[in-house]
From Swiss-Prot:
Belongs to the universal ribosomal protein uS12 family. The keyword rRNA-binding applies. HAMAP family: Ribosomal_uS12_B. This is Small ribosomal subunit protein uS12.
Amino acid sequence: MATINQLVRKPRVKKVVKSNVPALESCPQKRGVCTRVYTTTPKKPNSALRKVCRIRLTNGFEVTSYIGGEGHNLQEHSVVLIRGGRVKDLPGVRYHTVRGALDCAGVKDRKQSRSKYGVKRPKA
């Protein structure tokens, strides 16, 4: 326990919490325009072609965002919504595109976990 004199000389310092998703600026989602849509390979034990896109956000940030689900309709100049959430095996990818919002279509023929992929309830 510090004495009062010690606290007068050097007050207690608040810990600064650093955001994992700085480009969102404390917003739940942000809108942006795709500048490049491409595939990339994951880190060591995994192997795949992960679909990602480079996005210029409305606040001027340029970020890389993962496109989840099977198949997508994104190309350059598509307007997309991004949310936070990193992809563990893709270094530098800290955001996800929101499927079924703005220009990003939902996943075709998706039956389970539909809300995460922007798919409406199937008819009967």
